[in-house]
């Protein structure tokens, strides 16, 4: 009550923040006449003067903000024929301060972004603008690029599909770079797999503006970015598990109100938490079907995991809702946008389980080579900002996870859209009939209608019903997303009826003419409440842009997933009490609030899941940053590894004596010299005379082994000059580091999969995960030291005479081959070629010629062997 009175007197915190910005807007507006009088050239000169002051650090960005915003607005009027409204200036200031600007649909977020983008690009450190798809990235870069270029700033765009380093480097070196969230994230991961600093494409993380920030930082937060490679694991287990899963029967959980009650069936599905529990009866049945004694023995761990995933595939994942089958492949449908996620796969074997379920080719499992999350990627930026039409419902998460404050920007013109109460029916059939009747009424008077659905399946049901009713319409879902912009652009035409999944063309405005305005504007009909209120608000926001009239209403049923799982008991009781007959609906603010409470429950569950994911990834992220920082040190051309290699030899020798138990029972003279020498030969390819090691104390033995290895190593390296030696050491060391990191990620995946079971032992899984992951990381560090010594010792370089002889023989062979017919029948692979042996093209050639690799053995044509 007190807080309510306080708000009425002083306004909300958001109102007070906006008032502060309004004062500054007046100052910017006062500068407008000054800049209007300037010629184009004078504007450019003034901009360059301000830019020089920023580069020389004579002024801060905040000190010149008024001038820059006024200048940019004037330039926009001349170049784009668009003038920034006062509320757009407020939006620009919010973004510049590293906050989220919540701006309604049609308020011109793309134009708003130009203000902070240009201001921050003046430092020359680069600005990234992130969008949800390639179409919007290209469109915005092209349209706004005219303004940027007018002021002498360069702009480029990162698109999916092309991985040419030089093209991407040029794009990132531009003052302003547009692209999608996934491309920025994957480029970061790929950069940390490079073997030369000059091959990296990104140049740092200075300032980023994330468009549709709720979609990227909230909806996509549970989706890790993973670069993976193939494994050699068999796929038969997925087929066996699928066959067994089909023979198990779904049951019901024990009744908590009945003591002694037991679950029925072979497994229980918890739709609320999206988990499956196999009952004791189910375990026994599965063991018989698999032909094993104990399904949960360590030797059957993979089999039990496959069964869990097969049961999830059959009971929690629905075709045309969670995925589609396209061209013989299972393709994920993004639950928040309704778009197909081409190239993305479910992890932990779930995707293979879905492929087995659908009877399509099962693609091999992959192994993680590099990974991160959007949460940790975007938190690397010195300044992070975002804009969207719907952020307030997730303000707590933005604050806790990203330290981002949400500011709601007033609309330029008041919203005239009428949002009606929900209509709730008992069954889906009744609901869909009511929707068709309502669409028919609107269509007959010419009012355009956009019908929103939660899945492809529902959109196709409505499509068939509208077809039977003889109502012409368009359908927009993941199966025909290529026409997305075209279909959405026509949705506001008189008499248009459009069915759309959640994708609903974000970023594409639905414009209406005066005739449609007189008919009441665009009519939004939602056929199901989404788990997130934001998605519903986005659908509503398609109507009523920039003061246009419009209307929205949701049609629900007790059979809808949200109400069925989270909240229908209370609503059903109300409907029964009111005596609602078949075909009748209930419309009540109380019921609408009950639905919103159900949504809040789900949002809370999802928030906890994302927070949980981040807590675990924060552990991995610290390790990731350590490894990537070390990699960067190795890539530095001035970094000399000699001291590090010498230390590692001592570590290797110490570890060798300790793990091989050369000293028995603490007796220093009782060790097996022959065994020790054979281990060193196997590890390092170095033969050591036993007499050199006899009679030595422990410390002397460590020192002697390290010394012998150093002498032998220096002998091999003598055929190379200093620069070549450094390059070879770095390349080989990086290969060892990457292999060790890859193995570490695999071990971390295994650890994460089973760590939840520690909770049954009254231990905090997160604390246990931190302990275990630290131990694994220390093992990685130890393995890196010893494996690097082995790799560097075992490498052999050919002498100049051997190289020349091999080159002569290969040249003769190639000349003979020119006179022989080509044989395409025997298409064997070069089994010796592996990515690890790839030499960077600009590195000195290891042959000792002094030339770059690309100008020597890296040339096309006959290649000389480098590693003997």
UniProtKB/Swiss-Prot annotation:
Disulfide bonds: none annotated. It holds the Pfam family SecA_DEAD. Keywords: ATP-binding, Cell inner membrane, Cell membrane, Cytoplasm, Membrane, Metal-binding, Nucleotide-binding, Protein transport, Translocase, Translocation, Transport, Zinc. Residues 816-868 are annotated as: Disordered. May bind 1 zinc ion per subunit. Zn(2+) binds at residues 845, 847, 856-857. Belongs to the SecA family. Part of the Sec protein translocase complex. Interacts with the SecYEG preprotein conducting channel. Has a central role in coupling the hydrolysis of ATP to the transfer of proteins into and across the cell membrane, serving as an ATP-driven molecular motor driving the stepwise translocation of polypeptide chains across the membrane. This is Protein translocase subunit SecA. It comes from Campylobacter concisus (strain 13826).
